[in-house]
Regions:
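Charged, gly/pro-rich active-site loop segments
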Residues: 2-13, 92-167
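Short, basic/aromatic recognition patches
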Residues: 6-29
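A short, Trp-centered hydrophobic/proline-enriched beta-strand micro-motif
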Residues: 22-37, 78-82
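A generic structural signal for short beta-strands and their flanking turns/coil linkers
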Residues: 26-28, 44, 54-56, 74-78, ...
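Histidine- and/or cysteine-centered catalytic micro-motif in compact active-site loops
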Residues: 35-37, 46, 63-65, 83-85, ...
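Short acidic (Asp/Glu) patches
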Residues: 45, 62-66, 75-79, 108-119
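A short mixed-secondary-structure module that forms the rim of ligand-binding clefts
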Residues: 49-87
Length: 167
């Protein structure tokens, strides 16, 4: 029996999801990776504004004039990486981004905390929300993933029936 098969038999997807959620929830920042127009990868730190574990969505706010917004208009496949070095816990969330650019929706969802990043009226007019629906998760969490730590990835995939461990 391979280690991946043993892992599927011994690890509960719900337990892995709960641990992944705990790590993501407790990290104020994560790394968002998008594809550039030249085909490369762009990665930047982002502050989460919300994280919904029922729907497995993460929301960010950004400037609609930014390179990341341009990248997401071109292709909406993204990866988000969060980690907690003290716990040897690292999570890669893979999903699809949706830009929420409707000015009335942006005004409705606006919080005064965003004024720090969008200080002028012109900045506020160009603010947009990014909603990312997570479709798969890759985990490296000591005590949850196989040893030697970091050598094997534990993957969760979401389908119509919910989440399942795939490796």
């Amino acid at each position: 029996m391979t280690q991946a098969v043993e892992l599927r038999d011994s690890v509960d997807a719900g337990r892995l999801l709960a641990e992944a959620a705990r790590i993501v929830r407790n990290q104020p920042y994560c790394w968002l990776a998008t594809s550039s127009e030249a085909g490369g990868v762009r990665v930047r730190p982002m502050g989460k504004i919300s994280f919904n574990t029922d729907a497995w969505t993460i929301h960010f706010i950004t400037d609609g004039r930014s390179r990341k917004a341009s990248d997401l208009r071109r292709t909406n496949n993204v990866s988000i990486v969060c980690g907690r070095e003290a716990d040897d816990a690292y999570i890669a969330l893979i999903g699809t981004a949706r830009l929420r650019e409707n000015p009335s929706e942006v005004r409705e969802r606006w919080k005064s905390a965003y004024n720090t990043y969008f200080p002028t009226e012109l900045d506020k007019e160009n603010a947009i929300f990014i909603e990312i629906g997570i479709d798969s998760i890759e985990l490296w969490i000591r005590g949850f993933t196989p040893e030697p730590f970091g050598m094997h990835t534990t993957r969760l995939q979401r389908d119509a029936g919910g989440w399942r461990v795939t490796s």
